[in-house]
Amino acid sequence: MIPTGAAFVAGVTGDPIAHSLSPVVMRHWIDAAGIDALYAPFPISAGNFDRVVRGLAGAGCRGLNVTLPHKEAALELARTASGPARAVGAANLLTFTPAGIHADNTDIAGFLYALAPANVEFRKARALIFGAGGAARAMLYALLTVGVTDVAICNRNITRAQGLSRDIAPDAGIIPWEARDDALQGRDLIINATSLGLAGRDELALDWQRVRPGSVAFDGIYIPVNTRFIVESRARGVTAIDGLDMLIGQARPSFEAFFGRPAPDLPDMRSRLLEHLGAR
């Protein structure tokens, strides 16, 4: 239905945000639910984040999903926060209530939702995470909750990697960026939580010959779906998972938080997104 002047309004913010498929996901669910609602992208720069978010809250917006580079700032802005958001130190969901702004992190559930079909033996896994920002924080926390004990962090800024380890996983290994290929040896769960590979940016180049076929590789990027990380890991015989399913998985609880009802069951959502991207 076409939104009216009484529509519930929510959205997504980041910088950049034009690439986001969150409005597409939400539009499909809004239409399937038949509710009067609008979900829009809001490009907000870091310097304007607090002011604009507070303005949207004051204008009656129901809330925002939050992506790079604002996830840590979102948590700091909120008056209250869920336990997982506090533990991770980052939020990808802000809801605006009469009591104030509330922060949550649905990336944790979204990440595990995406990994589920791969049947990873988490307690035996040797994981390697590239990145140390808000997404990496959520993914590292998620791995710990399902029993992963052997994990290493590799980031271009080693100080941020050390901070991530200190905050969430003190026993995690810290790998200098220049040693990233050596770090692949013996790892069977490799995760790209950086922005490398996002359309218009540099790719994450790795020596996949060092990875055992049958391992699992996850890329949080979904535009493009077939990043260099995905294409080259798949060519090695690795189970490669792109970011689309994490997008869908993290969006479900967001929809309910914004609009007060569960997201409709659309088993073909991934196919709809691929069709939208022209990636079939």
UniProtKB/Swiss-Prot annotation:
Entry keywords, A to Z: Amino-acid biosynthesis, Aromatic amino acid biosynthesis, NADP, Oxidoreductase
Reactions catalysed according to its record: shikimate + NADP(+) = 3-dehydroshikimate + NADPH + H(+)
SUPFAM superfamilies hit by this protein: Aminoacid dehydrogenase-like, N-terminal domain, NAD(P)-binding Rossmann-fold domains
Entry annotation: catalytic residues: K71
GO biological process, any: aromatic amino acid family biosynthetic process
Pathway membership, UniProt: Metabolic intermediate biosynthesis; chorismate biosynthesis; chorismate from D-erythrose 4-phosphate and phosphoenolpyruvate: step 4/7
Domain of life: Bacteria
One of the record's GO molecular function terms: shikimate 3-dehydrogenase (NADP+) activity
Residues that, per the record, bind shikimate: S20, L21, S22, T67, N92, D107, Y222
CDD domains per record: NAD_bind_Shikimate_DH (cd01065)
EC number: 1.1.1.25
Enzyme class: oxidoreductase
Chain positions recorded as NADP(+) binding sites: G131, A132, G133, G134, A135, G220, G243
Subunit structure: Homodimer.
Family: Belongs to the shikimate dehydrogenase family.
This protein's name: Shikimate dehydrogenase (NADP(+))
